[in-house]
Regions:
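Short, well-ordered coil/turn elements that cap or connect secondary structure elements
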Residues: 2, 71, 129, 154-155
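Conserved protein kinase catalytic domain
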Residues: 9, 62, 111, 169-170
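C-terminal coupling/interaction segments
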Residues: 132-134, 138-179
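Generic alpha-helical secondary structure signal
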Residues: 3-7, 59, 108, 122-125, ...
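Short, surface-exposed beta-strand/loop "edge" segments at domain boundaries and coil↔beta transitions
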Residues: 44-49, 123-127, 150-155, 167
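ABC transporter nucleotide-binding domain
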Residues: 62-146
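ABC transporter nucleotide-binding domains
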Residues: 1-84, 88-91, 97
Length: 179
C-alpha cells in the first residue's frame, strides 16, 4: 500500500528529490522502513529493523507498525537486541542463545513462570537457598530471578515483581550469577 509508505516517509526528513546514495545510514533505514509499511503480507519478518535510528524514529516506527499494519489477521516477527523498546507490543517471546532456544512462551506466561525479588543484602543468603536462576547486586540490594516458585515464599524477603524482558534475557543468557 503506497499510501502507508508515503505517510511514513512524510514523517522523516527524506525528500522525494533526494537520491538514495545521498542519504545517511539512518535515512536509508527510514526509507527501508517506509517500504516495509507498504507491504501487505500475512507475516512480516523484521531483522533489527530500527538499527541505526535514534529513539524518536524507533518509537514512531513501532507505534505506526502497530497502529497501521497489525490488524490481528497478520503476524509480525521481530528479531532485536533492543527488547525494552518493543516489550509493550509483544505477545510472544523466544530467546535464542548460540542457536539454542532458552525461553519460548507467551508474554502472559512470563508473569506466571518468572518472579523477580529485590531484597536487602542481609536477607539475600536466605533467599538464595530457594535457588534463583539469576542474581545480581544492585547498590545495597540483591536482585534475584526465580522460575516456577510460589511468590508467597519470596514476599518475606522483599519486593516481588515480574521481571522486565531485558532482565529476563540477561538471566536466560548468563544463568545463575553472583556479583
Amino acid at each position: 500500500d503506497l499510501s502507508k509508505s508515503l505517510n511514513f516517509l512524510a514523517r522523516t526528513e527524506i525528500r522525494k528529490s533526494q537520491r538514495v546514495k545521498q542519504l545517511s545510514k539512518g535515512m536509508k533505514t527510514q526509507l527501508h522502513l517506509a517500504i516495509v509499511m507498504g507491504i501487505n503480507a500475512r507475516m512480516l519478518v523484521l531483522d533489527e529493523p530500527t538499527l541505526g535510528l535514534d529513539i524518536i524514529y524507533r518509537t514512531e516506527f513501532y507505534d505506526q507498525l502497530m497502529n497501521e499494519y497489525f490488524d490481528h489477521q497478520r503476524s509480525i516477527l521481530i528479531t532485536t537486541h533492543q527488547i525494552e523498546e518493543i516489550e509493550h507490543i509483544l505477545t510472544y517471546i523466544m530467546i535464542i542463545d548460540k542457536g539454542k532456544i532458552v525461553i519460548n512462551m507467551t508474554i502472559d506466561d512470563i508473569g506466571i513462570h518468572f518472579t523477580q525479588l529485590k531484597t536487602a543484602k542481609e536477607s539475600a543468603e536466605q533467599a538464595r537457598k530457594l535457588n534463583p536462576v539469576f542474581e545480581k547486586d544492585l547498590l545495597d540490594q540483591a536482585v534475584m530471578i526465580f522460575e516456577d516458585i510460589d511468590v508467597e515464599r519470596l514476599k518475606e524477603f522483599g519486593e516481588v515483581s515480574t521481571p522486565h524482558l531485558a532482565e529476563l534475557f540477561v538471566a536466560a543468557i548468563k544463568g545463575t550469577h553472583h556479583g
